[in-house]
């Protein structure tokens, strides 16, 4: 550990790799609700968060498990199509609560162009939530609807063992990964239908 009179111990959450306080301060200065997006290996989580002196207040939240439970999503919770659908869901939920604009908060995730984090953003914007951004950061349409996964599945199907190993999670739920784009559109339609009044 460093020593000397000029050494400063970083805040605990910074040491633990959980919070970038410089970024957080910049986001809070905007005065807008934050669209907080976090990703794990198997899932995405999105929240609309308001700052309060006593602690941040979560107004609405959505999890990819919700897509599976309430809308019949059979794909993986950590891929780009599920991220877009989650964004669509959190966007409609925010509008339902009267929140029409937000600023994106990706925490310590690297801002990689085309990443699934930005698929969540696209979904929220498509729902009608106003979030400042550049469209250049979005994933391509084929990644959003899962066509790239379907194409890979078609190629891998020739090797039955690897195919079942790679896509066992899809198959056990009754979804052929080659049909993921069609399934994506079905689930997207269900989300839109549920929030039809919000869109009106």
Curated annotation (Swiss-Prot):
Q: Name one GO cellular component term.
A: cytosolic large ribosomal subunit
Q: List the disulfide bonds.
A: none
Annotated Gene Ontology MF terms?
Answer: 5S rRNA binding; structural constituent of ribosome
Where on the tree of life does the source sit, at the highest rank? Archaea
Q: Which GO terms describe its biological process?
A: ribosomal large subunit assembly; translation
UniProt cross-references to Pfam families, sorted A to Z: Ribosomal_L5e (PF17144)
Q: What PANTHER family is this protein classified in?
A: LARGE RIBOSOMAL SUBUNIT PROTEIN UL18, RIBOSOMAL PROTEIN L5-RELATED
UniProt keyword DNA-binding present:
no
Against InterPro entries, the record matches this protein to:
Rbsml_uL18_euk
Q: From the Swiss-Prot or TrEMBL record, give the protein name.
A: Large ribosomal subunit protein uL18
Q: Which SUPFAM superfamilies match?
A: Translational machinery components
Q: Does the keyword Ribosomal protein apply?
A: yes
Role, per record? This is one of the proteins that bind and probably mediate the attachment of the 5S RNA into the large ribosomal subunit, where it forms part of the central protuberance.
The record describes its quaternary structure and partners as: Part of the 50S ribosomal subunit. Contacts the 5S and 23S rRNAs.
Coiled-coil region list:
none
Indicate the family of this protein: Belongs to the universal ribosomal protein uL18 family.
Q: What organism does this protein naturally occur in?
A: Thermococcus sibiricus (strain DSM 12597 / MM 739)
Q: Which NCBIfam families match?
A: PRK08569.1
UniProt entry keywords in alphabetical sequence = Ribonucleoprotein, Ribosomal protein, RNA-binding, rRNA-binding
């Amino acid at each position: 550990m460093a020593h000397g009179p000029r050494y400063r111990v970083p805040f605990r959450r910074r040491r633990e790799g959980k919070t970038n306080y410089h970024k957080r301060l910049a986001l809070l200065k905007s005065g807008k609700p934050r669209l907080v997006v976090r990703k794990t290996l198997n899932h995405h989580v999105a929240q609309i968060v308001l700052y309060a002196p006593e602690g941040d207040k979560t107004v609405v939240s959505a999890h990819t498990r919700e897509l599976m439970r309430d809308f019949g999503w059979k794909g993986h919770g950590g891929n780009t199509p599920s991220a877009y659908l989650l964004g669509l869901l959190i966007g409609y939920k925010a509008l339902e609560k009267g929140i029409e604009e937000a600023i994106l908060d990706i925490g310590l995730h690297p801002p990689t162009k085309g990443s699934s984090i930005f698929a969540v953003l696209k979904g929220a914007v498509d729902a009608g939530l106003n979030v400042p951004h550049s469209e250049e950061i979005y994933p391509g349409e084929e990644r959003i609807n899962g066509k790239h996964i379907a194409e890979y599945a078609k190629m891998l199907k020739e090797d039955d063992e690897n195919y079942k190993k790679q896509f066992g999670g899809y198959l056990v739920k009754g979804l052929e990964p080659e049909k993921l784009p069609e399934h994506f559109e079905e689930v997207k339609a269900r989300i839109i239908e549920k929030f039809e009044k919000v869109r009106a």
